[in-house]
Amino acid sequence: MQLTPREKDKLLISMAAEVARKRLARGVKLNHPEAIALITDAVVEGARDGRSVADMMEAGAQVITRDQCMEGVPEMIHDVQVEATFPDGTKLVTVHNPIR
């Protein structure tokens, strides 16, 4: 299977998000990379489902809460920017203060 660098990045993020979901299910708090992966994956999948950019900006901020993260992680993540493929093309989605 030949994958482009972008496809490899998407696959890596998807796998990291899956690991984060399993850890949350076990009650383990997320670290910085896991939190970013989970938020990013939610935005990418929502875009693929046909949701709007504005909708994904809001939805991305509701993926995880402060209680689900290790201490200090929410303060480290001010913005998450994701290039997501929407039905009308690829767009940059910025989620401000994603962990509330």
From Swiss-Prot:
One of its GO terms (molecular function) is urease activity. Its EC number is 3.5.1.5. Pathway: Nitrogen metabolism; urea degradation; CO(2) and NH(3) from urea (urease route): step 1/1. InterPro entries: Urease_gamma (IPR012010), Urease_gamma/gamma-beta_su (IPR002026), Urease_gamma_sf (IPR036463), Urease_subunit (IPR050069). Keywords: Cytoplasm, Hydrolase. The keyword Ribosomal protein does not apply. This is Urease subunit gamma. It comes from Roseobacter denitrificans (strain ATCC 33942 / OCh 114) (Erythrobacter sp. (strain OCh 114)). The lineage of its organism: Bacteria, Pseudomonadati, Pseudomonadota, Alphaproteobacteria, Rhodobacterales.
